[in-house]
Amino acid sequence: MSNEVETSATNGQPDQQAAPKAPSKKEKKKGPEKTDEYLLARFKGDGVKYKAKLIGIDDVPDARGDKMSQDSMMKLKGMAAAGRSQGQHKQRIWVNISLSGIKIIDEKTGVIEHEHPVNKISFIARDVTDNRAFGYVCGGEGQHQFFAIKTGQQAEPLVVDLKDLFQVIYNVKKKEEEKKKIEEASKAVENGSEALMILDDQTNKLKSGVDQMDLFGDMSTPPDLNSPTESKDILLVDLNSEIDTNQNSLRENPFLTNGITSCSLPRPTPQASFLPENAFSANLNFFPTPNPDPFRDDPFTQPDQSTPSSFDSLKSPDQKKENSSSSSTPLSNGPLNGDVDYFGQQFDQISNRTGKQEAQAGPWPFSSSQTQPAVRTQNGVSEREQNGFSVKSSPNPFVGSPPKGLSIQNGVKQDLESSVQSSPHDSIAIIPPPQSTKPGRGRRTAKSSANDLLASDIFAPPVSEPSGQASPTGQPTALQPNPLDLFKTSAPAPVGPLVGLGGVTVTLPQAGPWNTASLVFNQSPSMAPGAMMGGQPSGFSQPVIFGTSPAVSGWNQPSPFAASTPPPVPVVWGPSASVAPNAWSTTSPLGNPFQSNIFPAPAVSTQPPSMHSSLLVTPPQPPPRAGPPKDISSDAFTALDPLGDKEIKDVKEMFKDFQLRQPPAVPARKGEQTSSGTLSAFASYFNSKVGIPQENADHDDFDANQLLNKINEPPKPAPRQVSLPVTKSTDNAFENPFFKDSFGSSQASVASSQPVSSEMYRDPFGNPFA
């Protein structure tokens, strides 16, 4: 079956092939006369009939194939042999070959069993082991069938007729196409239709040629015209690889900003394609101009000092000199890839220019331009531009900065280094990632100093307070805009926050102390120590502490909050809402980072937390916003002064410690973020039924709490409808119910309903007295 019918390019080959065959009478008479006209006349009408038997029909997967046809023939012959052993006989048929195709007609009934047009016949195979058998494959795409036929005489004449049939059809079609082409050429061509028609003609020729050469080739398969699609795929792959390369350079750039970055190297002027106005023109071009240094973005190769980089063409001679001089300066953190850092710094400059308006809209009312001089680096690029958004963030009054005239190595000011180190704070702030010149690129440099959490201002000698203040938490602050600059003022000596800002007071809008848009303070007193603590408002209860101050104008009790160095500022709880510098030094969750130089340690023990809670209870509060876990401040109390208020501890404190162990940690953590209405319900519930959550504990705890509750219970007020903030529970960490009576019955009655509920939420941090 591997012997396919040879195709004839000329009409003379069939005559040469017919001579050595066992000639039939028909071929002897008509063989020499085979022309297109003769063949057309031969196959017109009913065409030629051959007597045969149908061996069988088998479904095949492909349109053509010698091995496939041979397997099907063997299978069908085996089935026919099995049927013959059972007395069955093959169906006697007539094979009719005409211009319409092949028809299989039942010999007895004359019914057309199968009819296959020429364009549905895809393959013909002769059985080389049986000269009376042949088969052909027909059917549409996915529906191919192999018909095995056993002729009454030699199968060769039938196969030759099939070959002649396809040859004449091909020749007729070819003549028609040529005639059509001549007619089209004589006509006037409009709108380029001639090219399309010629293309169609060539396609048809290819189809016909394929069919003729392969003998019943699949005419449904068009020629391969998919090369443009492949080229598009290649272009897309190249573009993606270019984007990935640039992203890798940015991804590696943050590791070069360790304290001493390559800020000492001069920044070249940004390329034109990196400017914001050209950001989406040159970079999105599928055919970018060739890069003189294609490996400049490789973050793992050291820059070759002898060969000029691709950025040298953009530098002025002065900048090149500065580059040669400053590149010889040894860096403490090893060799840095200057070009990669340039790439990142260009991106920072774009980010700074495009997002400057967003940076100015930060919550701090003071711009750093008022307190810090605009420092120019060696290459003339402003420090603010090199730092990205960090300089545009508002200053923090609690950290001093070097004087204006102080010069720092490499001509870069201190806050440049500190801003690079504290970049995790400045990126996660209010400013979203800027629009990048490359798709998928974020401000990756912001995440550089995950290992530098306590390293802000470490390299700044003039800073007047310990470096622990720079990064108070082990987590990147999530909500403060650029806390790096929040830690700096222009005053070199430790002073009060408002004094360090030149005595400017922050006035809070009287009608809207609760602006739920921001979790820290939305234009509220920015000088609170808790605000400096960077994006963890829940740990400090800041929205409760300072947001209520306009409504508590009647509580003019600045004495417990002015335990040390009261600056000349308005009253703490006055309507102006300016806060004393050390008002909440005890609520720091990190071991009081502000204790040195600004807040003396005695402020921790001299102000009992009950004073804060009693002042916060009375005014109506809107429900607090859900935020990070609000139980950090209780842990901070423990870290600051685990033995604080020991002179007023009593039996209630000791039994309270036993109760702290019982509630599971997870429910307590969820309970922290419940609404204030739920906490108020807890307060009223535990005011009358103390110890019920401790049913699984010892009955001694239950009785002791009931006894202490009866001792401590003042005249019960009506259940408070006022929304008590969730952060109230964190301030009650060390409340003493007996000590609160000194403030009067009204305060004691409200505050006494809180100890049990506050203890319910202190459990996740353990008990320092257990």
Swiss-Prot record:
Domain PID: 45-196
Region (Sufficient for interaction with SH3KBP1 SH3 domain) location: 709-725
Broad class of where this protein is predominantly found: cytoplasm
Listed Polar residues bias regions: 1-16, 302-313, 366-396, 407-425, 466-480, 604-616
Location of the protein in the cell: Cytoplasm; Cytoplasmic vesicle, Clathrin-coated vesicle membrane; Membrane, Clathrin-coated pit
Pfam families associated with the record: DAB2_SBM, PID
Spans annotated as Required for localization to clathrin-coated pits: 230-447
Motif range (DPF 2): 298-300
Impact upon substituting residue 166 to A: Impairs TGF-beta receptor signaling, no effect on interaction with SMAD2
Gene Ontology CC, one term: cytoplasm
Post-translational modification: Phosphorylated. Phosphorylation during mitosis is leading to membrane displacement.
UniProt motif DPF 1: location: 293-295
Modified residues (Phosphotyrosine): 170
Keyword field: Acetylation, Apoptosis, Coated pit, Cytoplasm, Cytoplasmic vesicle, Developmental protein, Differentiation, Endocytosis, Membrane, Phosphoprotein, Protein transport, Transport, Tumor suppressor, Wnt signaling pathway
Region Required for interaction with MYO6, annotated ranges: 649-770
Subunit details: Interacts (via NPXY motif) with DAB2 (via PID domain). Can interact (via PID domain) with LDLR, APP, APLP1 and APLP2, and weakly with INPP5D (via NPXY motifs); the interaction is impaired by tyrosine phosphorylation of the respective NPXY motifs. Can weakly interact (via PID domain) with LRP1 (via NPXY motif); the interaction is enhanced by tyrosine phosphorylation of the NPXY motif. Interacts with LRP2 (via NPXY motif); the interaction is not affected by tyrosine phosphorylation of the NPXY motif. Interacts with clathrin; in vitro can assemble clathrin triskelia into polyhedral coats.
Function: Adapter protein that functions as a clathrin-associated sorting protein (CLASP) required for clathrin-mediated endocytosis of selected cargo proteins. Can bind and assemble clathrin, and binds simultaneously to phosphatidylinositol 4,5-bisphosphate (PtdIns(4,5)P2) and cargos containing non-phosphorylated NPXY internalization motifs, such as the LDL receptor, to recruit them to clathrin-coated pits. Can function in clathrin-mediated endocytosis independently of the AP-2 complex.
Protein's name according to its UniProt entry: Disabled homolog 2
